[in-house]
Curated annotation (Swiss-Prot):
PANTHER family recorded: SMALL NUCLEAR RIBONUCLEOPROTEIN, U6 SNRNA-ASSOCIATED SM-LIKE PROTEIN LSM7
Biased composition range(s): Basic and acidic residues: 1-10
Sorted UniProt keywords: Cytoplasm, mRNA processing, mRNA splicing, Nucleus, Ribonucleoprotein, RNA-binding, rRNA processing, Spliceosome, tRNA processing
Main localization, broad class: nucleus
SUPFAM superfamilies named among the record's database cross-references: Sm-like ribonucleoproteins (SSF50182)
Quaternary structure, from the entry: Component of the heptameric LSM1-LSM7 complex that forms a seven-membered ring structure with a donut shape. The LSm subunits are arranged in the order LSM1, LSM2, LSM3, LSM6, LSM5, LSM7 and LSM4. Except for LSM1, where a C-terminal helix crosses the ring structure to form additional interactions with LSM3 and LSM6, each subunit interacts only with its two neighboring subunits. The LSM1-LSM7 complex interacts with PAT1; within the complex PAT1 has direct interactions with LSM2 and LSM3. The LSM1-LSM7 complex interacts with XRN1.
UniProt source species: Saccharomyces cerevisiae (strain ATCC 204508 / S288c) (Baker's yeast)
Gene Ontology molecular functions: RNA binding
Gene coding for it: LSM7
Identification of the protein by name: LSM complex subunit LSM7
Amino acid sequence: MHQQHSKSENKPQQQRKKFEGPKREAILDLAKYKDSKIRVKLMGGKLVIGVLKGYDQLMNLVLDDTVEYMSNPDDENNTELISKNARKLGLTVIRGTILVSLSSAEGSDVLYMQK
């Protein structure tokens, strides 16, 4: 009777090392805006305003007390908000891939603008 050995039994098990590239710094320092109200314009003409609770280097955001507004489709600059279509979202995660711009809700400081 012949015993069959698989190749994995003959070789000692090797630990696979997970590739870890250099840690990237955030595109912008949002730490000073943590627990502050920010205004986030999203692709598709939506705007959300909420309190920044967290973020990562990919610009994914966690906002609390978030309110979503639809902008007027005829307004090219998206400055006119349709407040009757405001929705309270509460705690929200926003993916960095859909951000158009990010600014302070109190002032007019633009923190981030998509190129």
